[in-house]
């Protein structure tokens, strides 16, 4: 059956058709939907793990047991999972093991623009890179075959545009491979130094065999053109190149980007008057081509940063190569439309429970070390509350170092903020360090009862699993106390006075402390909202105090405040800032 599918949904379909049995992932845009779609297949057990390292180790355990398994994450998640990645390259697999990493060129929702192809090279594992939804489905099945044939984990590299665009997929039935029997093999699976030394030559031999496979695999293909011009490309860049040049140039479309096909590249280059490599981010393919002695152009004319587009490629290549300008012709430009559309910067939603807390921190002129999640938006004006955001869990570790460096000077005004899901991901070890090494630090856990920014996924503190069924629930207060924190306070962020008192008290304390700011995300379906507030125009003096919250439901028209009833959820936080009492509920 032919279906129009999102790239991530197609990859999940490929897992199903390829006989996957176990999926363990951590949500992260743009990878999240793969696991959310996989859970819809009854034949696949799916779960959200506390972090990417746990997810990969879980998937490896399932592979060890003889089942085909999968774990998914965004690009920065592979940093977290790097430890098991490098060693399971040595151990190899039993059942097929796929690791999906979704890169984010242009950083639509990420803190960096790293290129995950380097991980495949460094870990010496194969990497496949689909260019549309159909390939996402087919490459998943191919990855399992490669994994089991070559005794290796396989990385599938997605990117934002492939993950979140749609194309036609020809769906097929499910393959049900038999469970491979588990056999104890200490030399293969127990990575003591002696065994690891023996396994390293296997990794090198496997890489050589994979390189030969890449030369003949249908994952890589040549599309011949009418001109003696060759373009080597992959993923999204392939789609742009095809749209610009049609059949005028020859294209080597790479679906397997590690190891790269040496012989195929050399053969493709023969007879070409001009050879280009078109790839987003780092010059991985270009560097390899140059190591083969090929004269190629790439990052000398194309940017190292951000996403490509057909317009960008047409402009850059036409300017650099007059011959290409003749072939490109006129490309309809979407830039004018982009320039005319007003910007819509991300903001915390109306009724967001984090807003009241950040207002309190801003009012108290706190130095705030932030973390990864919806609450990162607290850095935006008018709250402008966050001073640092690095990576998952870094706020808790960083405040320890910050306060150890500055002592009492910072202890009385510095806090760390971290979400409930992020705390479970990688904040606990930082808190253990605070308790163990006794820094007088205040950590605020923003507990909104969900993993919010990636689309409302469950986590170990919610009490529900990926299917919404009841599951084990970790109590944050008990956990913090068990880790050695004696001062644990819970506040409602809608109660500004309580927040203010808690912040002042804990900053004044002479020992480590935790404040749990607890209220469910305003967008959760079970959260009941109050009627929208209204503005008494006679009482409103236009002081703009309500605007200090940065709530999207509040605006100024003329000199008076206005509330958008379609957005307001009646949280009442703004009314607590309005001294004239102009903001209130509708009175009958």
Please identify what each model-predicted range represents.
Residues 1-8, 17, 130-348, 353-354, ...:
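Flexible, low-complexity linker and terminal segments
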Residues 1-133, 161, 224-225, 248, 379-516, 526-527, ...:
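Thiamine diphosphate
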Residues 104-153, 159, 191-194, 410-412, ...:
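Conserved thiamine diphosphate
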Residues 43-50, 91-102, 182-187, 436-449, ...:
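A glycine-rich helix N-cap at a beta->alpha junction
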Residues 34-37, 60, 81-85, 107-114, ...:
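Short acidic, glycine/serine/threonine-rich loops at helix termini
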Residues 37-43, 242-251, 478-484:
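Short helix-loop-beta junction
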């Amino acid at each position: 059956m032919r279906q129009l599918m999102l790239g991530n949904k197609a990859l999940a379909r490929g897992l199903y058709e390829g006989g996957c049995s176990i999926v363990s992932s951590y949500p992260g845009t743009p990878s999240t939907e793969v696991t959310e779609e996989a859970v819809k297949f009854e034949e696949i057990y799916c779960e959200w793990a506390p972090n990417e390292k746990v997810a990969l180790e879980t998937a490896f355990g399932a592979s060890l047991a003889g089942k085909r398994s999968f774990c998914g994450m965004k690009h920065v998640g592979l940093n977290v999972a790097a430890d098991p990645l490098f060693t399971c390259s040595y151990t190899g697999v039993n059942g097929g093991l796929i690791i999906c990493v979704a890169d984010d060129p242009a950083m639509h929702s990420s803190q960096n623009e790293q290129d995950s192809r380097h991980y495949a090279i460094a870990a010496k594992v194969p990497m496949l890179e689909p260019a549309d939804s159909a390939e996402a489905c087919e490459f998943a099945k191919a990855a399992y075959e490669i994994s089991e044939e070559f005794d290796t984990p396989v990385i599938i590299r997605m990117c934002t545009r492939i993950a979140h665009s749609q194309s036609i997929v020809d769906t097929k039935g499910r393959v049900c491979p038999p469970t491979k029997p588990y056999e104890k093999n200490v030399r293969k699976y127990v990575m003591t130094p002696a065994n690891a030394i023996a396994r390293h030559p296997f990794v090198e031999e496997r890489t050589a065999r994979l390189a030969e496979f890449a030369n003949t695999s249908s994952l890589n293909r040549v599309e011949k053109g009418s001109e003696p011009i060759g373009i080597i490309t992959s993923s999204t860049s392939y789609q742009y190149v095809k749209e610009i040049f049609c059949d005028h140039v020859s294209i080597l479309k790479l679906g397997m980007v590690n190891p790269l096909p040496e012989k195929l590249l050399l053969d493709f280059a023969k007879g070409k008057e001009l050879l280009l490599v078109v790839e987003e981010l780092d010059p991985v393919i270009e560097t390899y081509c140059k190591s083969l002695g090929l004269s190629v152009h790439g990052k000398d004319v194309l940017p190292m940063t951000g996403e490509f587009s057909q317009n960008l490629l047409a402009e850059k290549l036409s300017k650099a190569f007059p011959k290409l300008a003749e072939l490109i012709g006129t490309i309809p430009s979407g830039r004018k439309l982009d320039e005319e559309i007003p910007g819509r910067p991300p903001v915390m939603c109306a009724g967001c429970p984090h807003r009241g807390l950040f207002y309190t921190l801003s009012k108290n002129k706190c130095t705030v070390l932030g973390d990864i999640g919806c609450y990162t938006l607290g850095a935006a004006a008018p709250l402008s509350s966050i001073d640092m955001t690095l990576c998952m869990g870094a706020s808790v570790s960083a405040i320890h170092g910050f306060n150890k460096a500055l002592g009492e000077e910072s202890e009385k005004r510095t806090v760390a903020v971290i979400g409930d899901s992020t705390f479970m991901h990688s904040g606990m070890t930082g808190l253990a360090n605070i308790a163990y090494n006794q820094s007088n630090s205040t950590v605020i856990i923003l507990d909104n009862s969900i993993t919010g920014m990636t689309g409302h996924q469950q986590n170990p503190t919610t009490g529900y699993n990926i299917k919404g069924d009841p599951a084990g629930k970790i109590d944050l207060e008990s956990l913090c106390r068990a880790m050695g924190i004696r001062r644990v306070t819970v506040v409602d962020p809608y109660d500004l006075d309580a927040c203010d008192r808690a912040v002042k008290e804990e900053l004044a304390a002479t020992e480590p402390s935790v404040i749990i700011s607890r209220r469910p995300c305003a967008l959760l379906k079970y959260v009941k909202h109050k009627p929208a507030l209204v503005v008494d125009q006679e009482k409103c003096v236009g002081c703009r105090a309500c605007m200090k919250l940065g709530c999207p439901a509040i605006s100024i028209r003329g000199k008076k405040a206005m509330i958008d009833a379609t957005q307001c959820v009646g949280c009442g936080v703004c009314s607590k800032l309005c001294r004239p009492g102009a903001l209130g509920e509708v009175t009958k």
